[in-house]
């Protein structure tokens, strides 16, 4: 995945960037504030209220591999978040008391 630079208005924000790859999957990037020292990340969608939540974990059984803030999710995830004519999106994230990061898309 090619890391893309976020628009200036998001430069200092805690965020998740999602980009549709050539294969249709979702190439994702989270900022340093989100990723911490864990090696895996869990991503969940609630399509009814259009929210995403992320949580870091040390368990490979629960999450996908996180490498320097980048990770890949299946194409169905990308189709849910990105309309057909949109290649990428930036979602601002906020940490909740339950240790999950939440954002709206």
Would you name each region that the model predicts?
Residues 9-11, 30, 61, 78, ...:
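Compositionally biased, intrinsically disordered low-complexity regions enriched in proline and serine
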Residues 22-37, 67-84:
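Short beta-strand-centered segments at strand-helix junctions
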Residues 31-34, 54-64, 104-105:
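Secondary-structure transition/turn motif
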Residues 2-22, 35-58, 84-99:
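A short beta-strand-loop micro-motif that forms or neighbors metal/cofactor-
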Residues 65, 69-70, 80-89, 96, ...:
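Detector for the mature cores of small, proteolytically processed
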Residues 40, 61-68:
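A short, polar/proline- and glycine-enriched secondary-structure boundary/capping micro-motif
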């Amino acid at each position: 995945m090619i890391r893309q630079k976020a628009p200036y208005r998001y430069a200092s924000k805690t965020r998740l960037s999602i980009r549709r790859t050539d294969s249709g999957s979702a190439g994702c990037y989270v900022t340093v504030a989100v990723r911490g020292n864990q090696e895996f990340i869990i991503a969940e969608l609630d399509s009814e209220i259009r929210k995403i939540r992320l949580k870091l974990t040390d368990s490979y059984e629960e999450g996908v591999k996180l490498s320097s803030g980048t990770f890949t999710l299946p194409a169905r995830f990308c189709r849910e978040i990105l309309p057909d004519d949109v290649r990428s999106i930036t979602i601002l994230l906020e940490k909740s008391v339950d240790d999950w990061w939440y954002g709206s898309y």
